[in-house]
Amino acid sequence: MAEQQTTELTNIDLEAGSEWRFELEADENIALRTLSSDPVFINSQELTPSAWYPIYRHTKSALYAPTSARIQVTNLPASHYTSTSTVQPQLLNLHLAMERQRILSKRGMEQRGPRVMIMGPQSSGKTTVMKNLVNLALGTGMGWTPGAIGLDPSSPPNLIPGSLSISTPSHPIPTHHLAHPLGSPPASTAANTISGDVETASWWLGALEPTNKNAEVWRVLVEHMAEAWGMRCEKDKIANISGLFLDTPAAFTVPTLGTKKDDPKARYTLVSHAIQAFDIDTIIVIGHEKLHIDLSRLPLVQSRQLNVIRIPKSGGAVDLDDHDRETAHIFQVRTYFYGEPPLPPQISSLVGKMVSLDFELSPYSFQIPWSRLVVLRVGEENSAPSSALPLGSSKILSPLRLTRVDPSGPGHVVRLLNRVLALVDVKPEDRIVPAKESEVKEEVKEEKNEKDGEIKQDGEGEKKGEGKGEGEGEGEGKYGEEEGEAEGEDDEEEVPFREEIGTREVMGFIVITAIDTFARKYTVLSPTPGRLPTTVAIAGAIEWVDSA
């Protein structure tokens, strides 16, 4: 009761077409509700009248009132203000144009729904624009399920930093905290919100942005994602009609990103690649006039007659610094393992219906031998440098080459402690038989044929039986011994899997929290107890220290 008495309630009147903007600090949590019958929206999701809507710390957002309205806020944050400058009318116009395309597609007058790419510099509000457009589509009551494509690994819509994802939300997406801006994937506990179980497929880049070094890996990942979305549209007519929204990284604004050596004058190559892969028909540019002009002049854009639309950057978009981004990344990884955090008692105990945020997950920590968990890196190599090769020689390695990590090496080389690993499914056909093992099998086969030939020449049944048994025994023994040696060498030096597994859809994520060099074991944090679904993992550059 004492905690309830410290909760301060403040009423705020909003003019028609105005926004109430707020920025929560590390020690600020609020809950709000609308006291008027007229609708109030947060990222185009309508607030339920008189129901408390909790918002967790570090969140920066805004409420929009198309008509005059009154809201009530608990524990008014230090940074908040009301503004009549808003981009909601522009977003609504975009939505109406896309809704028309969906309806025409449903009637058979268009092949598919809108496919929209959203571009802009850092802190321009790309994810927020995408969230608004998705919520506007979901709020029509037409049963749309638009695809939300997350190509910004520094601001993942559903999972953790370093990941790319495809999700298909079917209900308006709430705004409660930094994690899961476009809905959370299914978990082992009951969902906290109606959009808590969003179907999500993920791929692992293992970095916060695409670069010229990982451009080839990026291209393959995007192609796999586009293929997965195409298969979904073939099976689900509604998904094809609903269309998709594609969030892009800020690095896409760099003209030379992904430019190849054989075509140094090419510009926006990764942008063009994504346009072709997902068959984009509309590009939305936020606030960047030069980018808008450059994209309009791209040969691919002109040949496909794409719509390139520029909208202003919202005045409520907050310029985030490195500390803000690091805070968001830590929160996102922690939420993946521990679930959504609980709100303080003075907010969760408010009288009135509200969305609960008190279902935490229970991650599982255990040890696993080095020999059982195969940790790989994509696009890296530990061979001798070019300077150590013979004069005139050069290294020719696949950009998708897999390299096995040796945990017994120096820490600055291994780089596994506190690293996030992506688990990938490995099938029997993904296994590569080492060269030595193949040679041993051939020797066994030849030996067996020779023995059979000698036995047939003898023509004696008793000797034939003895000879055959002896030959098989020797062959099997020799093969087993050689195979063991080959596997031992393979475990330490070669990667016994095809390169394709490095860019495959991932099954989940784990974190290596400790490395025991004496016992030769990892200590691993997994979101669920029990055995891992696979023992092959891909490492990247994403770190997270479990401070729980």
Swiss-Prot record:
Coiled-coil boundaries: none
GO CC annotations on file = mRNA cleavage factor complex
- Which stretches are tagged as biased composition: Acidic residues? 482-494
Q: Can you tell which superkingdom this protein's organism belongs to?
A: Eukaryota
Q: Which GO terms describe its biological process?
A: mRNA 3'-end processing; tRNA splicing, via endonucleolytic cleavage and ligation
| Disulfide partners | none
Any keyword ATP-binding? yes
Secretion signal span: none
Q: Which UniProt keywords apply?
A: ATP-binding, mRNA processing, Nucleotide-binding, Nucleus
For this protein, the record's HAMAP family field holds: Clp1
Q: Which family does it belong to?
A: Belongs to the Clp1 family. Clp1 subfamily.
Which cellular compartments is it found in?
Nucleus
Q: Which residues bind ATP?
A: 19, 60, 123-128
Its protein name is: mRNA cleavage and polyadenylation factor CLP1
GO function terms (MF aspect): ATP binding; ATP hydrolysis activity; polynucleotide 5'-hydroxyl-kinase activity
Q: Per the record, where are the segments of Basic and acidic residues compositional bias?
A: 437-481
Known function: Required for endonucleolytic cleavage during polyadenylation-dependent pre-mRNA 3'-end formation.
- The organism encoding this protein is Cryptococcus neoformans var. neoformans serotype D (strain B-3501A) (Filobasidiella neoformans)
Q: Where is this region: Disordered?
A: 437-500
Which SUPFAM superfamilies would you find in this protein's record?
P-loop containing nucleoside triphosphate hydrolases
Q: How does it assemble?
A: Component of a pre-mRNA cleavage factor complex. Interacts directly with PCF11.
